[in-house]
């Protein structure tokens, strides 16, 4: 037994030595290959997130750069293809003429009438419209007194193509009893609820949704608010050379048609002045739309913005008309014209300027829009007294403002 123990002991000691050597060898290998994980295993776990984050950021930046580059290439391809399509659709090759003879194209082609959009409205417009044009007025019972004054002025002038879109049953009955052409819409809860509102701003926003079908059917539409008196037939005073032809909120040639406005920043020293172009807004209560794609797109854009973000319809109307394309936004490519501010007259022009000028008082405007004043009905009646019945002092009792 003693001899056997003596023989086994050297082997056991040798095995232990070999195991130690193998362990040291593996430790050295691990130290060389993965020093952080081996030497500082615990701290590496704690710091793994911070070490990993910059690498992931770099990875995301690299991916973003690749995607941005591909996106730029795709955008260029779309632009090139769009230009090829435009050239293919162009019926004739256009060459620039001599200096002073070149004018851009601003009159877009009209859309092909699509009677399937609303067969019932199509049949009605065939009877009421004149030369494929129609005046459209949206109204509810809350504004009936003003509508009565307007309808009387329309009949007095002899306008035949005038159509009311009643927003409640009471006004529909009024149109029937007064033999006024009207269009009863199909039930639509989204429109019906707002249509019965007493808030004129809410009701006003509906017109952009309602007018779309008129344009789809191929009709030129002259939209009119109810606070307007007609003194002449407006269709004889339209140019029809633009997608949108609108009256202005401006009160003279500068504010209505545009002027330079100087912005002054003294901190910029010698470069302190910057010239800006300004124009007072188009009035969304009286405008003419040709049945073109840009006109329909305008209605769609305004309707979409109002439904998602709300806001005043006139502000949204002008934003889409005038804001240019810029990064993140593609502007509306619609041609536009401002109506003569003294023919299509707003109430500021009438009460602050015209009534105080003996020569200007002799001119007869096409319409008068009481958009600047809250006592609309009384001023509409006074305008009729002055321009129709010849009562020279009919306008004198009113203040310049409301």
Curated annotation (Swiss-Prot):
Q: Which residues are glycosylated?
A: 253
Main localization is Golgi
| Species annotation | Arabidopsis thaliana (Mouse-ear cress)
Give me any GO biological process, just one: cell wall organization
The entry summarizes the disruption phenotype as follows: Reduced arabinose content in the insoluble cell wall fraction of meristematic region. Reduced root hair length and content of arabinosylated extensins in root cell walls.
Q: Which GO terms describe its molecular function?
A: glycosyltransferase activity
One Pfam annotation, family name?
Answer: Nucleotid_trans
What protein family does this chain belong to? Belongs to the glycosyltransferase 77 family.
Q: Which keywords label this protein? A: Cell wall biogenesis/degradation, Glycoprotein, Glycosyltransferase, Golgi apparatus, Membrane, Signal-anchor, Transferase, Transmembrane, Transmembrane helix
Leading EC class:
transferase
Q: Any idea what this protein is called? A: Arabinosyltransferase RRA1
Q: Note the coiled coil stretches, chain numbering.
A: none
Q: Which GO terms describe its cellular component?
A: Golgi membrane
Matching entries from PANTHER family are given as:
ARABINOSYLTRANSFERASE RRA1-RELATED, ARABINOSYLTRANSFERASE RRA3
Ranges spanned by the short sequence motif DXD motif, renumbered to the chain: 225-227
So what does this one do?
Plays a role in the arabinosylation of cell wall components. Involved in the arabinosylation of extensin proteins in root hair cells. Extensins are structural glycoproteins present in cell walls and its arabinosylation is important for root hair cell development.
Domain comment in the entry? The conserved DXD motif is involved in enzyme activity.
């Amino acid at each position: 037994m003693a001899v056997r123990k003596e023989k086994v002991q050297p082997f056991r000691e040798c095995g232990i030595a070999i195991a130690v050597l193998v362990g040291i060898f593996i430790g050295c290998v691990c130290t060389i290959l993965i020093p952080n994980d081996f030497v500082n295993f615990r701290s590496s776990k704690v710091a793994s997130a911070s070490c990993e984050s910059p690498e992931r950021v770099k990875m995301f930046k690299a991916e973003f750069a690749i995607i941005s580059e591909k996106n730029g290439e795709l955008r260029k391809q779309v632009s090139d293809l769009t230009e090829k399509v435009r050239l293919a659709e162009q019926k004739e090759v256009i060459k620039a003429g001599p200096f002073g003879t070149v004018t851009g194209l601003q009159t877009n082609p009209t859309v092909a009438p699509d009677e399937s959009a609303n067969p019932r409205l199509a049949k009605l417009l065939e009877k009421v419209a004149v030369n494929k044009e129609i005046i459209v007025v949206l109204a509810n019972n809350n504004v009936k007194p003003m509508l009565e004054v307007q309808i009387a002025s329309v009949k007095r002038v002899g306008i035949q193509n005038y159509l009311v879109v009643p927003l409640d049953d009471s006004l529909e009955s009024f149109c029937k009893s007064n033999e006024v052409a009207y269009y009863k819409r199909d039930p639509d809860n989204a429109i019906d609820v707002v249509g019965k509102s007493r808030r004129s701003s809410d009701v006003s926003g509906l017109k952009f949704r309602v007018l779309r079908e008129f344009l789809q059917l191929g009709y030129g539409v002259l939209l009119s608010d109810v606070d307007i008196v007609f003194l002449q037939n407006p269709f004889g005073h339209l140019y029809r050379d633009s997608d949108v032809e609108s009256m202005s909120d401006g009160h003279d040639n500068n504010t209505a048609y545009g002027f330079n406005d100087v912005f002054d920043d003294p901190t910029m020293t010698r470069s302190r002045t910057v010239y800006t172009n300004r124009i007072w807004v188009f009035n969304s209560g009286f405008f003419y739309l040709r049945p073109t794609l840009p006109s329909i797109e305008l209605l769609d854009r305004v309707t979409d913005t109002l439904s998602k973000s709300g806001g005043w319809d006139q502000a949204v109307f002008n934003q889409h008309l005038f804001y240019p394309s810029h990064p993140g936004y593609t502007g509306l490519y619609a041609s536009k014209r401002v109506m003569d501010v003294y023919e299509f007259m707003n109430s500021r022009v009438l009460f602050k300027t015209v009534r105080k000028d003996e020569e200007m008082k002799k001119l007869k405007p096409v319409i008068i829009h009481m958009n600047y004043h809250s006592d609309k009905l009384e001023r509409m009646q006074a305008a009729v007294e002055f321009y129709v019945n010849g009562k020279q002092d009919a306008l004198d009792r009113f203040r310049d403002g409301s």
